[in-house]
Amino acid sequence: MGETLGDSPVDPEHGAFADALPMSTSQEITMVDTEMPFWPTNFGISSVDLSVMEDHSHSFDIKPFTTVDFSSISAPHYEDIPFTRADPMVADYKYDLKLQEYQSAIKVEPASPPYYSEKTQLYNRPHEEPSNSLMAIECRVCGDKASGFHYGVHACEGCKGFFRRTIRLKLIYDRCDLNCRIHKKSRNKCQYCRFQKCLAVGMSHNAIRFGRMPQAEKEKLLAEISSDIDQLNPESADLRALAKHLYDSYIKSFPLTKAKARAILTGKTTDKSPFVIYDMNSLMMGEDKIKFKHITPLQEQSKEVAIRIFQGCQFRSVEAVQEITEYAKNIPGFINLDLNDQVTLLKYGVHEIIYTMLASLMNKDGVLISEGQGFMTREFLKNLRKPFGDFMEPKFEFAVKFNALELDDSDLAIFIAVIILSGDRPGLLNVKPIEDIQDNLLQALELQLKLNHPESSQLFAKVLQKMTDLRQIVTEHVQLLHVIKKTETDMSLHPLLQEIYKDLY
């Protein structure tokens, strides 16, 4: 007979996985025995484009697991945000020359351009988007749409060229004392006042800057835009409050942020560099040098390396499921959904989120392990015997493309919430409230990306496309697990993962 939470019947088929979800404090939580031999090097959860460091993710590391104990869910201290439709907005021990080669690989190189097909774009919403005009950065001189950061300010092509010609040719204009108003249509009428306006807003030949906009300038600009948006569209303030709440919850739920992982991978940290594992010898050295949270039992040292690594990944995945579940509780409206639907949403969403966040720990050459203490090379993982050598390659391919989008933790916090609240998961009982929550999250994500990446007009569509890619990766992962189940008869999956994978794709 199924357990109940209030009036919500709990499908007994969900078993232990349902124990990760809301239950009254008086109810006992079923404990899942996770006692299983494993090797303590695990993979984590995140995403990496290491040339530009941003915010949040996981690491592959093993903690002692005897039980999976999910605490009861209580309503988060959060002021409800209405779900009505709003108008948008990765050593020091040098074994040989080959190690030095891999050490240099830790620095992330520019990722290849992301694949995107407009034909597969998700969530095309037929509502008006006045946000486009609100987000257009205006020329500080005439108010036309700015083409970039020119001579120290944001300016359009016309005013940039006008200022350049004036300075280069040392032009002197007839004085005008009328203080003419300079705007898009009148900017060519009074050259004197136009040049004075250029100087007044801060244009200077000495202010030419190359490369990306300085962070301080970017923050100032975003603050100005945000203020204007909130005044013109008060509902956007609710979306930004939602984004901040999700970011705060994300930071509390996940131990290794994308920003920290990128700092490790790019060497921009005061901590020592991660220990590089690229072959069997370095693997054995790593087991001595890296401070794993769980000591591998001596009797397990004889197990084949591929199996030990695979089992280690399993236990990290279990830990990740717990972290994701805690995060999901803090998504406004999630704990009010039917309990069976909460289980279903997590069952289908956790691995998509794991691979999203795993990307933060990756570059094209390898992945951070054990909370950034180690770096296991892509080639080493790829050369493990089949089918184990096939598991990580699709994740690396996805990470390279996903990292090219340069999302930071504040972006990822909303993106993974959108993944969780997917109303098209099989077996959902009440789709409407799920879609309502996701629709609000999508609007918050769109606004967040426009504010945080004003130069990337198509980023929202590209990010949503990655949701389709993630589903394909999970499908392929499950298919490989079926192969292992048939070929590795002496090895079993973790009970919680068995439950998640059951009937999954």
UniProtKB/Swiss-Prot annotation:
Region (Interaction with FAM120B): 205-280
Function according to Swiss-Prot or TrEMBL: Nuclear receptor that binds peroxisome proliferators such as hypolipidemic drugs and fatty acids. Once activated by a ligand, the nuclear receptor binds to DNA specific PPAR response elements (PPRE) and modulates the transcription of its target genes, such as acyl-CoA oxidase. It therefore controls the peroxisomal beta-oxidation pathway of fatty acids. Key regulator of adipocyte differentiation and glucose homeostasis. ARF6 acts as a key regulator of the tissue-specific adipocyte P2 (aP2) enhancer.
InterPro entries xrefs: 1Cnucl_rcpt, NHR-like_dom_sf, Nucl_hrmn_rcpt_lig-bd, Nuclear_hormone_rcpt_NR1, Nuclear_hrmn_rcpt, PPAR-gamma, PPARgamma_N, Znf_hrmn_rcpt
Organ and tissue specificity: Highest expression in white and brown adipose tissue. Also found in liver, skeletal muscle, heart, adrenal gland, spleen, kidney and intestine. Isoform 2 is more abundant than isoform 1 in adipose tissue.
Record text about domains: The 9aaTAD motif is a transactivation domain present in a large number of yeast and animal transcription factors.
Pfam family name, one: PPARgamma_N
Molecular function, one GO term: promoter-specific chromatin binding
Transmembrane segments: none
Gene (name only): Pparg
Positions of short motif 9aaTAD: 495-503
Assembly: Heterodimer with other nuclear receptors, such as RXRA. The heterodimer with the retinoic acid receptor RXRA is called adipocyte-specific transcription factor ARF6. Interacts with NCOA6 coactivator, leading to a strong increase in transcription of target genes. Interacts with coactivator PPARBP, leading to a mild increase in transcription of target genes. Interacts with NOCA7 in a ligand-inducible manner. Interacts with NCOA1 and NCOA2 LXXLL motifs. Interacts with ASXL1, ASXL2, DNTTIP2, FAM120B, MAP2K1/MEK1, NR0B2, PDPK1, PRDM16, PRMT2 and TGFB1I1.
Zinc finger (NR C4-type) boundaries: 139-159, 176-198
Disruption-associated phenotype: Mice develop abnormalities in circadian variations in blood pressure and heart rate, in parallel with a reduction of diurnal variations in the sympathetic nerve activity, and impaired rhythmicity of BMAL1 in the blood vessels.
Documented activity regulation: PDPK1 activates its transcriptional activity independently of its kinase activity.
Residue range(s) of DNA binding per entry: 136-210
Ranges of residues in domain NR LBD: 238-503
The record's account of how the chain is modified after translation: O-GlcNAcylation at Thr-84 reduces transcriptional activity in adipocytes.
Chain positions carrying an annotated carbohydrate: T84
Protein name as catalogued: Peroxisome proliferator-activated receptor gamma
Family: Belongs to the nuclear hormone receptor family. NR1 subfamily.
Induction: Expressed in a circadian manner in the aorta.
PANTHER family: NUCLEAR HORMONE RECEPTOR, PEROXISOME PROLIFERATOR-ACTIVATED RECEPTOR GAMMA
Record localization: Nucleus; Cytoplasm
Annotated GO CC locations: cytoplasm; cytosol; nucleoplasm; nucleus; RNA polymerase II transcription regulator complex; SUMO ligase complex
